[in-house]
Swiss-Prot record:
Substrate binds at residue 136. It is found in: Membrane; Apical cell membrane. The active site is at residues 149, 153. It is a peripheral membrane protein. Highly expressed in kidney, liver and epididymis. Expressed at intermediate level in lung. Weakly or not expressed in brain, heart, spleen and testis. This is L-xylulose reductase. Its EC number is 1.1.1.10. Homotetramer. Catalyzes the NADPH-dependent reduction of several pentoses, tetroses, trioses, alpha-dicarbonyl compounds and L-xylulose. Participates in the uronate cycle of glucose metabolism. May play a role in the water absorption and cellular osmoregulation in the proximal renal tubules by producing xylitol, an osmolyte, thereby preventing osmolytic stress from occurring in the renal tubules. The lineage of its organism: Eukaryota, Metazoa, Chordata, Craniata, Vertebrata. NADP(+) binds at residues 11-39. One of its GO terms (molecular function) is identical protein binding. Its main location: membrane.
Length: 244
């Protein structure tokens, strides 16, 4: 199925690894031009070697001023994927100020800032656009030691709805994808303990974790005109976890 992404220009944050990297590769394969944002230069260099033509931008999205400078002249963007995130896991009684600041700065504040930059450009050009925020099932279910992470993703879901409300009149659609555990290299490492994995898998009706392509396919669908009447949604990619 042709998603009609050829010739469009996309920006993907957290593009160096995992879901972000795979999203960049899928967008390029679909004929889109892609700006890849990561804080890790080595990851960007490796991505460009694998996929020539990707436009790399190296910046720490937790730094508001640096992000403003790095993206102020990024050029026209039609599609945005806010994927960058951190997960700093601590028991509630041990949550630190540093974990709060870092998590909210990257997982929420940076989404606001990058989306403002991109949406203002869309509005100035008078063109429609699509934004996808990568959220999590943790936005809607409490998970042990995920106090700050769950809170940032819950806020991201509401931000998605607010953006959809206020950007809709400008023909900009905004949606979120909410995956379960995803089998990125980090996901495989973090959930390699069979006892830990079983506790989560027992809550997933399909009995398995998500593969990266499950999430990427959903992102591309939400970016495409095939989802032209969909905005303000938080779409689970969770094997039924949120249905239980």
């Amino acid at each position: 199925m042709d998603l009609g992404l050829a010739g469009r220009r996309a920006l993907v944050t957290g593009a160096g690894k995992g879901i972000g990297r795979s999203t960049v590769l899928a967008l390029k394969a679909a004929g889109a031009q892609v700006v890849a944002v990561s804080r890790t230069r080595e990851d960007l260099d490796d991505l460009v070697r694998e996929c020539p033509g990707v436009e790399p931008v190296c910046v720490d999205l937790a730094d508001w001023e640096a992000t403003e400078q790095a993206l102020s002249n990024v050029g026209p963007v039609d599609l945005l994927v806010n994927n960058a995130a951190v997960a700093l896991l601590q028991p509630f009684l041990e949550v630190t100020k540093e974990a709060c600041d870092t998590s909210f700065n990257v997982n929420l504040r940076a989404v606001i800032q990058v989306s403002q930059i991109v949406a203002k450009g869309m509005i100035a050009r008078g063109v429609p656009g699509a934004i996808v925020n990568v959220s999590s099932q943790a936005s809607q279910r409490a998970l042990t030691n995920h106090t700050v992470y769950c809170s940032t993703k819950g806020a991201l879901d509401m931000l998605t709805k607010m953006m959809a409300l206020e950007l809709g009149p400008h023909k900009i659609r905004v949606n979120a994808v909410n995956p379960t555990v995803v089998m990125t290299p980090m996901g495989r490492t973090n959930w390699s303990d069979p006892h830990k994995a079983k506790a989560m898998l027992d809550r997933i009706p399909l009995g398995k974790f998500a593969e990266v392509e499950n999430v990427v396919d959903t992102i591309l669908f939400l970016l495409s005109n095939r989802s032209g009447m969909t905005t303000g949604s938080t779409l689970p990619v969770d094997g039924g976890f949120l249905a239980t």
